[in-house]
UniProtKB/Swiss-Prot annotation:
Protein name per UniProt: Endoribonuclease YbeY
Binding site for Zn(2+): H99, H103, H109
Compartment annotation: Cytoplasm
Cofactor annotation comment: Binds 1 zinc ion.
Keyword terms of this UniProt record: Cytoplasm, Endonuclease, Hydrolase, Metal-binding, Nuclease, Ribosome biogenesis, rRNA processing, Zinc
Enzyme category, top tier: hydrolase
Protein's GO biological process: rRNA processing
Chief site of localization: cytoplasm
Family the entry assigns: Belongs to the endoribonuclease YbeY family.
Function description: Single strand-specific metallo-endoribonuclease involved in late-stage 70S ribosome quality control and in maturation of the 3' terminus of the 16S rRNA.
Gene3D superfamilies named in the record: Metalloproteases ('zincins'), catalytic domain
GO molecular function, one term: metalloendopeptidase activity
Lineage of the species this protein comes from: Bacteria, Pseudomonadati, Campylobacterota, Epsilonproteobacteria, Nautiliales
EC number in record: 3.1.-.-
Amino acid sequence: MIDFDNRTDYEFDINKLNDIYNLLTDKDIELILTDDEEIKELNSQFRNKDKATDVLSFPLEAMPGMPLGSIVISIDTAKKGAEEFGHSVDDEIRLLFLHGLLHLLGYDHETDNGEMRAKEEEIIKKLNLPSSLIVRNED
């Protein structure tokens, strides 16, 4: 189950994430949709980066019955990404959710040998989503 906390005025149908969620996990996940100001504070506090970002993931310890973790997405940055790459804001949120969920599942594109990129591309092709974050950020 996805526990959705929308802290913005943007109306997003959480059911648009069910296909990604069902392909990757059956664990509970918290999803927070926020703005650049709040995500900047979190990024500074937890990653020592004093800037807004698109998505943050906070995994929880692997304990039976516990949620997998939390994903925080900035709607402000998602809107910019959607405009820059020519797709809908909803598709950008789906991409960010996929990226964040893969991090919760233990993937790390900064340290792995392409496993996260391959998994992200596999899901993107299966669900006919726009280009992945990893591929976009490598250009």
